[in-house]
């Protein structure tokens, strides 16, 4: 969970800035990420689909609980719907089927966070979604996620002193 504990922090500004940075990094590194996923998944799982099922929900899950706790359920649902619209307008528009899988993935991640039974586990989520995990998939996912998240996490932390 994000350690939002200081009253001087603008939660909306910090969260918005963080996701804007992530989105920019995602766009900038899209081809490299796509190449990684081509090697991480079997032929039955298109790489574009894998990105939206794995990387984006993982990034979203980083802030899902604290944002909901601070903003409240109504505001959280509004922000989530806006995010889905933005994802839908990006490189590989998601069909209703993919949106449902995205939401299911997010639900699985939240359950693991809430009951403390699991942190983000790519292979477990892949199996829950009926896909076949490949060797090194989790490591590749983790490294790609870290590549995108860490620089912006650092910038947001320096600006808003989250820690």
Label every model-predicted segment:
Residues 1-6, 162-163:
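Short, aromatic- and cysteine-enriched interfacial helices/patches
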Residues 5-46:
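Short terminal alpha-helical segments
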Residues 29-72:
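N-terminal interaction modules that seed assembly of large macromolecular complexes
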Residues 38, 60-68, 84, 88, ...:
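Alpha-helical repeat scaffolds in large eukaryotic proteins
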Residues 50-54, 58, 78, 96-101:
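Residues within HEAT/ARM-like alpha-solenoid scaffolds
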Residues 64-79, 92, 96:
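Short, solvent-exposed secondary-structure capping/transition elements
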Residues 74-86, 140-151:
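Amphipathic alpha-helical scaffolding segments
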Residues 99-163:
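Low-complexity intrinsically disordered segments
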């Amino acid at each position: 969970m994000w350690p939002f504990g200081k009253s001087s922090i603008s939660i909306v500004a910090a969260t918005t800035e963080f996701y804007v940075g992530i989105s920019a990094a995602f766009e900038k590194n899209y081809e490299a990420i796509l190449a990684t996923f081509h090697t991480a998944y079997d032929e039955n799982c298109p790489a574009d689909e894998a990105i939206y099922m794995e990387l984006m929900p993982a990034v979203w899950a980083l802030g899902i609980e604290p944002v909901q706790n601070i903003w409240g359920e109504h505001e959280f649902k509004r922000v989530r719907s806006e995010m889905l619209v933005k994802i839908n307008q990006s490189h590989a528009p998601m069909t209703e089927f993919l949106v449902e899988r995205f939401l299911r993935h997010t639900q699985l991640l939240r359950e693991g966070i809430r009951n403390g039974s699991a942190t983000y586990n790519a292979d477990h989520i892949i199996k829950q979604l009926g896909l076949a995990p490949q060797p090194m998939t989790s490591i590749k996912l983790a490294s790609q996620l870290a590549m995108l998240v860490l620089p912006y996490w650092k910038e947001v932390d320096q600006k808003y002193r989250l820690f």
